[in-house]
UniProtKB/Swiss-Prot annotation:
Cofactor(s) it depends on: Fe(2+)
Tissue expression per record: Widely expressed at low levels.
Membrane-spanning intervals of the chain: none
Pathway(s) per entry: Secondary metabolite biosynthesis; flavonoid biosynthesis
Family: Belongs to the iron/ascorbate-dependent oxidoreductase family.
UniProt note: phenotype after gene disruption: No visible phenotype under normal growth conditions.
Cofactor descriptive note: Binds 1 Fe(2+) ion per subunit.
Keyword vocabulary terms for this entry: Iron, Metal-binding, Oxidoreductase
Gene expressing this chain: FLS3
Protein name: Flavonol synthase 3
Length: 308
């Protein structure tokens, strides 16, 4: 099975959905279909200005090009149990290959959870650009959540409310993958599914994201102005299995620096989530997953403990 899983093809393309199509019903249907069959898709003409995305990429790259001492000004404290801050992460994937990536985590919404201590002061535009991007990405994510809720036959607020409503958190992560002379020995990010509800990601021109479908790894082709949307575990479980939490990974590039900006849309740690009650309607629609407090689910998944 492992040999099969390591097979790689590029003949399939992840779905690309044009949000400027005036037929919103058609757009919503495409989003639902992609979430059911793939768990990953790209949206284009999504309303977030291309100039803003390019500025986001620029200030992020400038931060990671700073001397290490400057980056350490926003480092994750050694004794912190939270995730926010800058750090260099080393780990091995299931095949024993080294995985390394420098990264920076900080929340961008809601305001009550934003800690500017972990937002770089250099480059000077960093805070302004990220605040502007946060307002746009929140609006886009809420629209996608509405379509996904309606795709379940529910009120358009259902998934947002199930995730926590106004307490939903938006966690920005910047992944910085330096060039690697031998990508076969190193991976950028090991195979995984996201624990959260939905992830919205932009990246620079160095491709490297792969998704697992039909027992094959597929290169995710994308443009720097497009947004990659990834369905996570919370929406898999809240939809009672109707939406797919896609397994994905990041590979290294021999010559180019790859950098990506996922925003994880997730519950607060104390939020209870599970199959939405409206979907559990009788013997044919029994719950497929146990409900969890989000922090307990994250802990059990991290420790590879039994979940259901």
């Amino acid at each position: 099975m492992e040999m099969e899983k390591n097979q790689h093809i590029s003949s399939l393309d992840i779905p690309v959905i044009d949000l400027s199509n005036p037929d919103e019903e058609l757009v919503a249907s495409a989003v639902v279909k992609a979430s059911q069959e793939w768990g990953i898709f790209q949206v284009v003409n999504h309303g977030i200005p291309t100039e803003l995305i390019l500025r986001l990429l620029q200030v992020g790259m400038e931060f990671f090009e700073l001397p290490e001492t400057e980056k350490e000004a926003v480092a994750k404290p050694e004794d912190s149990l939270d995730i926010e801050g800058y750090r260099t992460k080393y780990q091995k994937d299931l095949e024993g290959r080294n995985a390394w990536v420098d990264h920076l985590f900080h929340r961008i919404w809601p305001p009550s959870r934003v800690n500017h201590k972990f937002w770089p002061k250099n480059p000077p535009e960093y805070i302004e650009v990220n605040e502007e991007y946060a307002s746009h990405i929140k609006k886009l994510s809420e629209k996608i959540m509405e379509w996904l809720s309606e795709g379940l036959g529910l009120r358009h607020e259902a998934l947002k409310e199930g995730l926590g409503g106004e307490t939903i958190e938006y966690l920005m992560k910047i992944n910085y993958y330096p060039p690697c002379p031998d990508p076969e020995l190193v991976v950028g990010a090991p195979d995984h599914t996201d624990v959260n509800g939905i992830t919205l990601l932009v990246a620079n021109e160095a491709l490297g994201l792969q998704a697992f479908k039909d027992n094959q790894w597929i290169d995710a082709e994308y443009t720097t102005s497009g947004i990659i949307v990834i369905i996570g575990d919370q929406f898999l479980r809240m939809s009672n299995g109707k939406y797919k939490s896609v397994e994905h990974r990041a590979k290294m590039d021999k010559e180019k620096t790859r950098i990506s900006w996922p925003v994880f849309v997730e519950s607060s740690l104390d939020q209870v989530f599970g199959p939405l009650p409206e979907l559990i309607t009788g013997d044919e629609n029994v719950p497929k997953f146990k409900p969890y407090v989000y922090k307990d689910y994250k802990f059990r998944k991290l420790k590879k403990l039994l979940l259901d």
